[in-house]
Structure formats: structure tokens, C-alpha cells
């Protein structure tokens, strides 16, 4: 008699109550991890630029939530965050260095814990006139 295969256990994952909602908004380019902290005694603290970015990003996110009618879902819903970077010049930048501050400042507004966030950098290009970060945010279903 063949042994029954054990079911593969998944991470904690709730099915979204609002699976078809999508939130789109633009933000200024985030401060990179390299410019996020400064030394303060025995520790470190956020730079003024990082604190200002958090305020701006949270304000813009709140506006988008209100204007687009975004509804918060269950705690253990996973979210996809597609990111489109438009840099102001051709200087070499690591777009991945911008994720830490961005995800930390959106935590509590769009999702409960950035553990449940799947950030995906989709595109990086040049836009001298309007440098920005465009975000498309939506829940991931169990079958995706």
C-alpha cells in the first residue's frame, strides 16, 4: 500500500476579503539606506531627510487611500507592491536600497506587518522632469 503524501504546510496566509482592489499612487523617490541614519551617541537615528520622507510618503498614501476607497484587509493577507522608479539623472543607483524606508513608512497604513509584503521592482528609467516612484499595490490570492 502506497504511503499517503503529507500535505505541504504553507505560511500563514488569509484569503483577501477584497481581492480585486488595487491602489495606485506616486511618491517622491525614497531616501536610500545609505542616507537613512546618522550616528547619535552609541546608536543611530533617522536623518532629517528620512523623517521628512516618512511624513510626505504617509500623507500621500493617506490621500490615495481616501480618494480610491482602499479597504484594509485581514492581518495575514499577503500584498504585492509593484514599483516603478523614475530617476532624475543617469547616476548609478541601487533601487533596492530604497525599499527599507519605503516599506517601513507604509506599514500600518496599507498592511499590518511588512512581513506580508512582496515588493517587486518592475521598471527603472530616467525622467529628468518628474523623478518619482509609482506604486501599484494589491492583495495576493492564495492561488497566485
Regions found by a protein language model. Name each.
Residues 2-144:
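Acidic, proline/glycine-enriched N-terminal capping motif
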Amino acid at each position: 500500500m502506497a504511503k499517503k503524501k503529507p500535505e505541504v504546510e504553507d505560511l500563514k496566509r488569509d484569503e483577501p476579503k477584497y481581492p480585486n482592489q488595487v491602489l495606485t499612487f506616486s511618491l517622491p523617490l525614497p531616501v536610500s539606506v545609505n542616507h537613512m541614519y546618522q550616528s547619535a551617541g552609541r546608536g543611530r537615528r533617522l536623518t532629517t531627510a528620512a523623517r521628512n520622507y516618512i511624513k510626505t510618503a504617509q500623507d500621500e498614501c493617506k490621500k490615495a487611500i481616501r480618494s480610491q476607497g482602499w479597504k484594509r484587509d485581514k492581518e495575514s493577507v499577503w500584498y504585492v507592491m509593484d514599483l516603478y522608479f523614475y530617476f532624475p539623472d543617469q547616476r548609478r543607483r541601487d533601487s533596492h536600497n530604497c525599499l527599507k524606508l519605503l516599506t517601513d513608512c507604509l506599514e500600518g497604513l496599507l498592511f499590518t506587518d511588512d512581513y506580508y509584503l512582496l515588493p517587486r521592482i518592475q521598471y527603472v528609467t530616467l525622467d529628468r522632469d518628474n523623478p518619482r516612484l509609482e506604486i501599484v499595490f494589491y492583495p495576493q490570492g492564495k492561488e497566485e
